[in-house]
């Protein structure tokens, strides 16, 4: 939680409509889903255990840089395939409780490789957690392998190669995250071309901490979805491009406010994007670290920005339509949305 008051804490409980609305989530980091109690529990397996209070303290930060340090501190506690199995399974249980039918989840593969972990073994743990979660909770989940900008293009290529290795085992795409201010999208062109040539889908975090030029760069990488796109509104030509091409934008309201990327609730462009015809989706980003949930993000949109139930249903539909699911599965889930569950 940031040192400012948690934005979602002031919201009323999500409505019955929101709780019952079938949803998809497209911008969700596995490692950002670890609740403090679980992080403390995992740390007990090793020689540097955390108390719950110490774990909670890791999730306090004043801005985006502080958030990245908190994320790093949390991920350093993950060491074994069993750790990843635990958090994958528990994430799927949480998704089911929020009526999320499908999620596409970022895994920080770049960090695993940077730390010289045995990622092949870690992936087996991830798949065990996913398979158990799907069996018990009925949630559909696909993996997106995430590279870290500040590690550079060679490390990003290693992430993409791992995605290609596992692309027939529920790995659907690749993305690039981290600090946009340190490495522009153009550095990763070869990695994105390699991924596309091998049938992987493409996403990119862009316009979160920098301006519209980063979003243009992501589009030039042939990114099919844009994570955050917080500053697209500053460029009318870019807005027109997003609308004309119906490029899905992964909006993360609480995240943008808690990292201070958006200084005031009123300044967030969600409503502006929706009214202009941008294909927006709602997402949590790092729900445990921002003390939010997808139901609360929908409640945020309704209570702060005045979205009607019908408009929230349209946003939920965008989530399924913008997913990287195969056409048949996508139609199945859209039919469940239309049927109400």
Go through each PLM region and give its residues.
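Conserved hydrophobic beta-strand within the GNAT/NAT acetyltransferase core sheet
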Residues: 202-204
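Metal-cofactor-binding active-site regions of metalloenzymes
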Residues: 2-200, 209-214, 220, 224-225, ...
